[in-house]
């Protein structure tokens, strides 16, 4: 079972989103419902690659604050954070507050999915990412994310190891057609290949990958903080 926690508008689009979530068996009991407008997102595809435009000023999802956060029920065991929700305040600081509040009880997975064009305050964003990295149990990045996080000539796996340093976290690197790599908490490097595929578009590809990781760990009874810390190659 999956629940969503976000700011949700009472407008037409918010009602449509809520119905779609319900039809997809995604719970909405933790959503913070308000009268602000729904964020609008537009996608343009070029050779299967997506570029995005968002209209998000004063939106229902962006304007939530830490005081809006609901208490989570004991059946919530894992929290997933990522994307542009971590870029702009007040929502970005609200999600950080949630992660820090729940890290002792819940597995935290983070996919920063860094989009430089949406970052309005780079220094604050880097500080926020460092704080949420510190409480995350699973961190998934792309090579583009790593290049932004750790600029310089070092090879990509060295940068992934640098990001893992001092953390008992599983680090996952997606490599497109070359599959994925992971550094386990003990430093073991695991590589997984993927079969060739014809790319139609990449919208939702990262989210689907992350859902697969969490579903696999859940099905193997490994989606707990203790089990993740003991993962071995």
List each language-model region with its residue ranges.
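Acidic, amphipathic alpha-helical patches
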Residues: 69, 129, 199
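Conserved N-terminal subdomain of the carbohydrate kinase-like
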Residues: 3-81, 108
């Amino acid at each position: 079972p999956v629940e969503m926690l976000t700011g949700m508008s009472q407008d037409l689009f918010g009602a449509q989103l809520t119905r779609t979530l319900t039809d997809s068996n995604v719970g909405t009991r933790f959503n913070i419902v308000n009268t602000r407008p729904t964020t609008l997102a537009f996608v343009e595809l070029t050779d299967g690659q997506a570029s995005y435009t968002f209209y998000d000023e004063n939106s229902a999802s962006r304007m939530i604050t830490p005081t809006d956060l609901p208490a989570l029920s004991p059946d919530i065991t894992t929290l997933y954070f990522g994307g542009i929700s971590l870029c702009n305040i007040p929502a970005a600081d609200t999600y950080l507050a949630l992660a820090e509040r729940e890290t002792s009880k819940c597995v935290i997975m983070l996919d920063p999915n860094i989009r430089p064009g949406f970052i309005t305050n780079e220094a604050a964003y880097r500080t926020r990412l460092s704080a949420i990295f510190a409480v995350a149990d699973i961190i998934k990045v792309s090579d583009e994310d790593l290049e932004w996080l750790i600029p310089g000539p070092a090879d990509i796996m060295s940068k992934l190891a640098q990001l893992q340093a001092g953390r008992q976290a599983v680090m996952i690197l997606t490599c497109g057609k070359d599959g994925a790599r992971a550094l386990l908490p003990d430093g073991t490097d695991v590589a997984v290949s993927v079969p060739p595929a014809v790319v139609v578009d990449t919208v939702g590809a990262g989210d689907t990958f992350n859902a697969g990781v969490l579903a696999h760990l859940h099905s193997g009874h490994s989606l707990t903080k203790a089990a993740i810390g003991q993962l071995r190659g």
